[in-house]
Amino acid sequence: MKKWMMIVMLCCGVLMGCSEKTYEPREIVSETDVCKICNMSIVHNAYAGQIALKNGDYEIFDDIGCLMEYIEANGEGEIGAAFIKDAAKNEWIDVFNAVYVYNKDYWTPMNYGVVALDSKEAARAWMTKEGEGQLLAYKDLQDFKWGIHK
């Protein structure tokens, strides 16, 4: 009987070890957080982004363009999760599932003109209020021309 209990406990331990870790966004501290790419202070939290690395560290960004530059340089392999602020709600949303809108006239901290929203409906509402733009998905951002847009 003890042998079977040990086997069951061992199996439970193995299964618990296989559970996927969950990652949560951390609070941005404007006084101390700086963008990993451009070293600017995170003054405009409504446009901030962050990557939770699998090792527990966080990389912070002041604009989606800087976050994407980091991913391009480092790949996605060590990313546990990535978050960007929803431009309409000022809430954290998943970078990989967000809907993006580009308009060269949208103001963003690094002048990339790309904002993130949680749905196509929210993106359309944003464009109605702020001016027409180009709808983009995460995969589109990977090929986007990220220079500072004028």
Regions inferred by a protein language model and the residue ranges of each:
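Post-signal-peptide N-terminal segment of Sec-exported extracytoplasmic proteins
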Residues: 31-76
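Positively charged n-region of N-terminal signal peptides that target proteins for export
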Residues: 1-4
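C-terminal motif of bacterial Sec signal peptides marking the signal peptidase cleavage site
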Residues: 14-17
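Short, flexible, mixed-charge glycine/proline-rich loop motifs
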Residues: 24-31
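Mature extracytoplasmic domains of secretory-pathway proteins
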Residues: 59-94, 99-100
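C-terminal partner/receptor-binding element of secreted or periplasmic proteins
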Residues: 118-150
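Bacterial signal peptide processing site
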Residues: 19-21
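Short aromatic-glycine-(Arg/Gly/Cys) micro-motifs in beta-strand/loop hairpins
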Residues: 44-55, 93-109
